[in-house]
Each structure stands twice: as structure tokens, then as C-alpha cells.
Amino acid sequence: MPDYDNYTTPLSSRYASKEMSATFSLRNRFSTWRKLWLNLAIAEKELGLTVVTDEAIEQMRKHVEITDDEIAKASAQEAIVRHDVMAHVHTFGETCPAAAGIIHLGATSCFVTDNADLIFIRDAYDIIIPKLVNVINRLAKFAMEYKDLPVLGWTHFQPAQLTTLGKRATLWIQELLWDLRNFERARNDIGLRGVKGTTGTQASFLALFHGNHDKVEALDERVTELLGFDKVYPVTGQTYSRKIDIDVLAPLSSFAATAHKMATDIRLLANLKEVEEPFEKSQIGSSAMAYKRNPMRCERVCSLARHLGSLFSDAVQTASVQWFERTLDDSAIRRISLPSAFLTADILLSTLLNISSGLVVYPKVIERRIKGELPFMATENIIMAMVEKNASRQEVHERIRVLSHQAAAVVKEEGGENDLIERVKRDEFFKPIWEELDSLLEPSTFVGRAPQQVEKFVQKDVNNALQPFQKYLNDEQVKLNV
């Protein structure tokens, strides 16, 4: 039954995918602890600890997935002992009596908590990387589709030289490619804390193996292997260095900036009525203004991107204040910031997937806006054409300057249309180029190499970057909960 009397974060209850929510769920956390205890016991037995029996391992393996009743029992136990790990040690031991005496043998709490966090981080990156790949792929298709469509460029949000809609999309894609590189690097850099003991010296395991250093090292390597990792951090304190969390969250925060910029661009384009995010037939934009088509998905992206970007400072500050081998003031904030970061990144990517799959373009609006500004941009072309007809460059410049100011006054002071070209056509001075004016005002001649840049970028940079991820590419429609 839903619990309507307790607060739940909207990240999981409203927005995030079931897959990401499950990754950071209590069930997965506590079941992962059990997997860690199981694999520790397996490795200890393989290396000769006879106190670990086959029966103990079989019972642990059978009950590695924690039940609702066991979660409740451990929660009640934690209220008594004030230690979450020991509460679960006792609960697991009650379920697996043959293993009760060897669960957590030689380990400290961070064996399960830190190693589990590293597993969650790896798994979370494995969820968001395919989504990022598909966002890039869909935007690349959009860029190619509109590589030749001239649009008014904007600098300082003032009209500037023309570009193409496809070229504008490549600016988003390029930053997303950098994010993909950063995600992959962060994911592949993750190792395990491993089997290190209370202060990282492995003293407890050295005692278990009666001073046999080789077996302690073998234990560390075997547990790492059993958990599916190819590397373990060579030295730690009680915890793995919290600087690793910085390396984990930095790419996510950087991606947040990319997402915010892209969504902001689309929001501005929606105001200009040139490009809009998808809008469902039954979607309501405003409870009062029935005509509204608000860019609510892009607005959500901007909102959550600000949250994701802010979490990076949590990691930086936490890493900087860790004393010696560890302090516990990292614990509470990490329980919040790490899941929040990945849940938020997951939401952003799902939303961007939805947006990029259904962007709506209005070419006629784009064309009308270009026509309103292009005459001013074409003045240099007009000057050059007149000079080729043996006119004085300075005289042409002065005449076109006067006409441009008159046309600007019509636009700004009277609210009229830009009539510069009509003024040029009425001025006998410009008669030598009247027949050329239409060609001088062809928008495609003002976009430079934008179409060629799009083709080269997609065919070379994008395709090469996506080549290792072909198995993830799909055209599935992403449905958002809200």
C-alpha cells in the first residue's frame, strides 16, 4: 500500500526510472551487503579457512536476497544497537545459522558499505551511459535532417549571422560527446575498496591467515574478482578515498551544465515559435490560459540540472575534511548526494531522450524571421555588388546606411516590417543590381560551411564515438511518468 504520510523524494517517486531507483533501493543495498559477505566467505574458504563451511556458504547463497521481513527485523535491531551493519550481520546470521559465526569475518563495516557504494556507482553508470548514447544518436539524426535549414544566429540573444538548425544541434552534441567520454572514464576508473580491515592495514586478515601475507593479498584479489571488478585500490584508510567521489560526481555535474544549456536553447526557441519540445494531445499548458504550450520538459531539465550541478560541492567538501584514516561525517551526506546525483542524471537523460525524439520545427516561422533581419545583413553584399558595377564604395556605403536607418525606424518606431529592400528597389542609384537582389538575399548563401561542418562532424566525430556502443542504439520512445 502507498504510504501517503511520510515524505519521499520526488526523484524516485515522480521522475526516475525503475531501474535506477532499484539500484539505490534499500533492498538492493542490503542484498549487496549479503553478496559481499558471501563472496568474502567463499574466498576465505578457498584460501584455507576451515572455519568457513560448505553449509555456511550454501545458506548464505540461498538467502542472499533480503526479504521484507528481514529488512524490518534489521531496522528494529538497528534501533537497539545503533549500527546498521551489525544489525544486518545479526539478521543475516539468524537466517543462516550455520554461517552466523563467520559472517563479516575479519571485516570492518566499510567492507560492505564502501564496496557496495562502488558497485552501485558502477551499475548506475551502466544505466545512464546507454541513455546518453541514444540522446547523442537521436540529436545526430536531427542535425543531419536540418543541416541545410538556415536559421537566424543569436549572439547576446541579438540577431547575428545565419547558421543552420542542424549546425546549432551539433553544438549540443559536441558537449554531450565530451560528457560521454567523461562518463566512460569515470566508470572504467572505478575499483573496489577490497578487503582492507579497520584502518586499511589488513591486520585482521593477516591474523586470520597466521601471518601469511600472500594469502591476504590473494584474498583481496579473489574477492575483487568474484564481484566482477578488474582492479582494487592498492591502499585505503578505513574507507576508500572520498576523492573518488569527486571523480564520480564531476562528470555528472559537467553533464548537468550541458543539459541546462541545451534545454535553455530549446526554451528560447519555443518562445520564438521556431522549435518546440513534444507536446501531447491531452497535455495542459496552463490551468488558466488554455492556449499555452509551455516547454515544461525543458524547464524540468533546467531545474534538475541546477540540483545535479550543486552536488559536486558536497563531494569536494567531504573529501577535504576527512581526518586521517576516516571520520564519520562523510556518511550522512553521501547517503544523500550519491543516489541523488545518479537519480537526477537518469531523469535528465530520460527527459532529453523524450525531447530529442520529438522536436517540432516550424520552417515558415524561421523563414519569416530571417526575412525580417536578412536585409540588414545583406548590406555588405549589396555594397560589393554595386562596386562591381563601378559605383564608389564610399557613396554606396552612405546611401545604404541612410536607407538602413530609415528601415530600422519603421521596424522599431512604427512596428512595421523591414522594408530596406523595397527602399533599395525604389532608389534609382541601385538600379544596376535590382535584378541581383533576390540572389543576394538567398539565405543559404549566408550560412557559410555550416552544412558541410554538420556532415563531417556527424560522419566522423559522432559515428566514431558511438561505434563501441552500437548494441545500445535503439529507436524506442521514452514515456515520462509526468
Swiss-Prot record:
Recorded metabolic or biological pathway in which this protein acts: Purine metabolism; AMP biosynthesis via de novo pathway; AMP from IMP: step 2/2; Purine metabolism; IMP biosynthesis via de novo pathway; 5-amino-1-(5-phospho-D-ribosyl)imidazole-4-carboxamide from 5-amino-1-(5-phospho-D-ribosyl)imidazole-4-carboxylate: step 2/2
Domain of life: Eukaryota
Active site feature: H156, S286
Binding site for substrate: R14, Y15, R82, H83, D84, T108, S109, Q238, R300, R326, S331, R335
EC number(s) on file: 4.3.2.2
SMART domains: ADSL_C
Gene Ontology CC terms, in alphabetical order: cytosol
Pfam families, per the entry: ADSL_C, Lyase_1
Keyword Hydrolase assigned: no
Main enzyme class: lyase
Cross-link (Glycyl lysine isopeptide (Lys-Gly) (interchain with G-Cter in ubiquitin)): K196
Tagged with keyword Disulfide bond: no
Listed GO MF terms: (S)-2-(5-amino-1-(5-phospho-D-ribosyl)imidazole-4-carboxamido) succinate lyase (fumarate-forming) activity; N6-(1,2-dicarboxyethyl)AMP AMP-lyase (fumarate-forming) activity
GO biological process, one term: 'de novo' AMP biosynthetic process
InterPro entries: AdenyloSucc_lyase_C, Fumarate_lyase_CS, Fumarate_lyase_fam, Fumarate_lyase_N, L-Aspartase-like, Pur_lyase
Enzymatic reactions: N(6)-(1,2-dicarboxyethyl)-AMP = fumarate + AMP; (2S)-2-[5-amino-1-(5-phospho-beta-D-ribosyl)imidazole-4-carboxamido]succinate = 5-amino-1-(5-phospho-beta-D-ribosyl)imidazole-4-carboxamide + fumarate
Keywords: Isopeptide bond, Lyase, Purine biosynthesis, Ubl conjugation
Family according to the record: Belongs to the lyase 1 family. Adenylosuccinate lyase subfamily.
Subunit structure comment from the entry: Homotetramer. Residues from neighboring subunits contribute catalytic and substrate-binding residues to each active site.
Name of the protein: Adenylosuccinate lyase
Organism: Saccharomyces cerevisiae (strain ATCC 204508 / S288c) (Baker's yeast)
Name of the coding gene: ADE13
